């Protein structure tokens, strides 16, 4: 079994003085695996990503990255330690070229040879980046822009990538491409913590599924088994699985 590269341990977190959204949540993420968070609206899925990425400090509990306690560190510090975050929606800079967008992901790389090597690596992973390198990012389709975001996130060779609703607003064909690219990340050894509106499809390709309810992990287990469970389908996944 691969090592745990990201771990949220007994996390309590919320916003302002309101009641906590996360109430003692624990989630492990192993190297080269996709962990998918599912559950009803308000269960705390996106809050988990905010805590993991440093956007929201927990009230209690710990976040460990490669065994190191990184609770409360800024997103910039976490990026330098190997954790990247692809935000919900489209975060490309539309008035910049694909090349300029991708290079932003390597802004801390001072060694030109290493920077060139990373650019070639992401071009190999994401063909649209190579093909549209000098195009304005705003001219790309939604699915192509998402691939540019993935490429930018991988420029610093993170061990963990957080993905928040990566297929939001995409048609079925581009959604399929996004899932293929997530699988490609996994096969390169990157760990992925995923929140996805297309919950059943995400569980079918993930390794571990965690069903959140009322700020806790209600059920966890092999993701494909959860996707096929008719009880979970009715409660959380928009109906029973097709037979």
Task: List each model region and its residues.
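Conserved catalytic motifs of ABC-family nucleotide-binding domains
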Residues: 157
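ABC-type ATPase nucleotide-binding domains, specifically the catalytic core motifs of the NBD
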Residues: 16-17, 98-117, 125-127, 221, ...
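Conserved ABC ATPase signature
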Residues: 136-140
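The feature captures the beta-strand-to-loop junction immediately N-terminal to the Walker
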Residues: 38-40
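Conserved ABC transporter NBD signature motif
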Residues: 61-68, 81, 114-119, 221
